[in-house]
A protein has these predicted regions:
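Metal-dependent amide/peptide-bond hydrolase catalytic core
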Residues: 2-231
Length: 234
């Protein structure tokens, strides 16, 4: 892992006119918020390819014999199996609604309603994320930053990288080390503030039929013991 998306968790709040649920109300905060959240969830973000992402897909194309089109890398996603679930998210910014909060009783129209959005931006595209969210929701819904962290991207080169690559091929001669951009984040963000260049290195060898990415924060989150044993050797 030679790059990471940045993080912007934000709370959206809509205000309206509180009232009885049995009456007409054209200033329903929950209705306004729901419409904004739906627009965010369905928004089709433009493709943005960073240096690390291009490097990854060039190597995928070389390994599979498939054509490489630097203007559209999405066709190559089918060549990387379940990993495409995460890698696909590194071709663009993302913003996923994750939490909703409004009201306290079935027959009361709330005066306010809020939602939490998990925004992730590519290196160099934080402003695109923020400005797009603002344009989607309009001026009547407020945005509050819950948490924000930087994006990272470093060169996939140097003695440390060579050591990682040689360790993998020593225990798996058919293994092809490639860089990738992580859709989440690690402590490397904090280390970068100290001038320390860090890489993610998790040498797990996983069964071909395991959709490993689907297990992240999912039901029965786990990792095969054989994969860990391989990683310890590496």
């Amino acid at each position: 892992e030679a790059a990471q998306k940045g993080i912007h968790w934000m709370r959206l709040t809509a205000k309206g006119r509180a009232g009885h649920g049995s009456m007409m109300n054209d200033e329903n905060a929950l209705t306004a918020l729901s419409e904004a959240v739906a627009k965010i969830g369905r928004y089709n973000w433009p493709q943005r390819y960073t240096k690390v992402v291009k490097d990854l897909f060039k190597r995928v194309a070389q390994a599979t014999g498939r054509p490489y089109d630097e203007n559209d890398l999405r066709p190559l996603l089918r060549e990387i199996g379940p990993t495409a679930r995460m890698i696909g998210a590194t071709l663009q910014n993302t913003a996923n609604p994750t939490m909703l909060e409004a009201g306290y009783k079935a027959n009361v129209i709330p005066g306010t309603a809020s939602a939490v959005i998990d925004g992730r931006f590519l290196p160099g595209y934080e402003e695109e994320l923020n400005s797009t969210i603002k344009s989607i929701i309009g001026p009547d819904i407020s945005i509050e930053t819950i948490s924000r962290d930087i994006a990272l991207e470093v060169d996939f080169a140097g003695d440390l990288v060579e050591s990682m690559c040689s360790a993998i091929t020593e225990f798996d001669p058919e293994g092809i080390p490639v860089p990738y951009l992580m859709s989440g984040g690690t402590d490397n963000k904090a280390l970068s503030d100290l001038g320390i260049i860090g890489y993610g290195f998790s040498p797990l060898r996983l069964p071909e039929d395991l959709d490993f990415m689907a297990l992240f924060h999912g039901v029965d989150e786990r990792v095969p013991i054989e994969g860990l044993e391989f990683g310890v050797k590496v």
